[in-house]
UniProtKB/Swiss-Prot annotation:
Transmembrane segments: none
EC number: 4.2.1.51
PROSITE patterns documented for this protein: ACT, PREPHENATE_DEHYDR_1, PREPHENATE_DEHYDR_2, PREPHENATE_DEHYDR_3
Full protein name: Prephenate dehydratase
Chain positions of site Essential for activity: 171
Top-level class of the enzyme under EC nomenclature: lyase
Pathway info: Amino-acid biosynthesis; L-phenylalanine biosynthesis; phenylpyruvate from prephenate: step 1/1
Entry keywords, A to Z: Amino-acid biosynthesis, Aromatic amino acid biosynthesis, Lyase, Phenylalanine biosynthesis
Length: 279
C-alpha cells in the first residue's frame, strides 16, 4: 500500500505515518492540498493530513479540501500529543528569522514574543520543512519551531524545549481512504463525522438539525461551520458524533429524520480513534 502524508520526513504527520504504517510505502508531499490530491488522482491508497489542533482549532485547508474537492472517507483518526521546540544549527546561533508551519507558530506565539520579539516569523508548509531549511542554510541567522524527531533527523541543536504556550497540546490527524481501517495501536473510541448543508427555507434549521441527535441522547462532540463558497452567509456544518454500541443503533434513524427535514447529509467517515505517544 502507498500512503501519502504531509512531509518532509520529520513532520508530525510523518511521525504518525511511521507509527501506523511500519511496513508500507510512505510518500511525503509538500502541502496538504498535494496530499489529498494525490489520493484523488489514485497516486496512493491512503492520505494522512492534520485536521485539528487543541490550541489553534481546525486546519481549515484540510477540511475544505475534503469537503469541496474529494470523495475520500475518514477511515481512521490519530491523536498525537505535540511538543514544540526551537531548533538551530548551533546554540550560539544568532536568531533573526524563525521558520515554521502557521499552526506551530500560533501554538508558540507567547514564547516567541517574549524571547524573540524582533525576530521575523517566516511561514513554511510544515515544521519539518522549516527544520530542513534551517539545516540547509547554516549561515542564515535562523531557527525553526519543530519536534524532537526533526531535530535528530536534521542534526539541529535545541535552543529551547517544550515552548508551546499551553500544556496538553495535541493534534488530530485523519487518514483518508475508502473503508474503515484498524491498527495495532491504543484505540480510545469510535466516531462518526457528518457534513450537513441546511435548507434555505427551514426556520430554525440548525436547531432542528441538532435536535435529532439531542432527543436521542447521541453525544455530539463537535460542531463547526465552514463557508459553502456559494454566497456570503452560506455554510456547511461539520459534526462529530460518539459512535458507541448504543449510538450506532440510533444514528441511522437520526440521519433519516435529517433527510425528512430537507437537510443534505454527507457521511465523511465512520472510524476508530487511536492515541499515540508524545513526540
Amino acid at each position: 500500500m502507498k500512503i501519502a502524508y504531509l512531509g518532509p520526513r520529520g513532520s508530525f504527520c510523518s511521525v504518525v505515518a511511521e507509527a501506523a504504517f511500519k511496513s508500507e510505502e510512505l510518500y511525503s508531499y509538500a502541502t496538504i492540498l498535494d496530499v489529498i490530491e494525490a489520493y484523488n488522482e489514485g497516486e496512493c491508497d491512503f492520505a494522512l493530513v492534520p485536521i485539528e489542533n487543541s490550541t489553534e482549532g481546525t486546519v481549515n485547508m484540510s477540511i475544505d479540501k475534503i469537503f469541496h474537492d474529494s470523495n475520500a472517507k475518514v477511515v481512521a483518526e490519530f491523536v498525537l500529543p505535540i511538543s514544540q521546540n526551537l531548533l538551530a544549527v548551533s546554540k550560539e546561533q544568532k536568531i533573526e528569522h524563525i521558520y515554521s508551519h502557521p499552526q506551530a507558530l500560533a501554538q508558540t506565539r507567547v514564547y516567541l514574543r517574549k524571547f524573540y520579539p524582533q525576530a521575523q516569523v517566516e511561514i513554511t508548509e510544515s515544521t519539518s520543512a522549516a527544520a530542513e531549511f534551517v539545516k540547509n542554510n547554516p549561515d542564515l541567522p535562523a531557527a525553526a519551531v519543530a519536534n524532537s524527531f526533526a531535530a535528530k533527523m536534521y542534526d539541529l541543536e535545541f535552543i529551547a524545549e517544550n515552548i508551546q504556550d499551553l500544556a496538553g497540546n495535541s493534534t488530530r490527524f485523519w487518514l483518508l481512504g475508502k473503508e474503515k481501517q484498524s491498527f495495532d495501536l491504543n484505540q480510545t473510541k469510535d466516531k462518526v463525522t457528518l457534513a450537513l448543508t441546511l435548507p434555505d427555507n427551514l426556520p430554525g434549521a440548525l436547531h432542528k438539525a441538532i435536535s435529532v441527535f439531542a432527543w436521542r441522547d447521541i453525544d455530539m462532540t463537535k460542531i463547526e461551520s465552514r463557508p459553502l463558497r456559494t454566497r456570503l452567509g452560506q455554510y456547511f456544518f461539520i459534526i462529530d458524533l460518539e459512535n458507541n454500541a448504543t449510538n450506532s443503533l440510533k444514528i441511522p434513524y437520526a440521519l433519516e429524520e435529517l433527510a425528512g427535514l430537507g437537510v443534505n447529509v454527507r457521511l465523511l467517515g465512520n472510524y476508530s480513534v487511536y492515541s499515540l505517544g508524545e513526540v
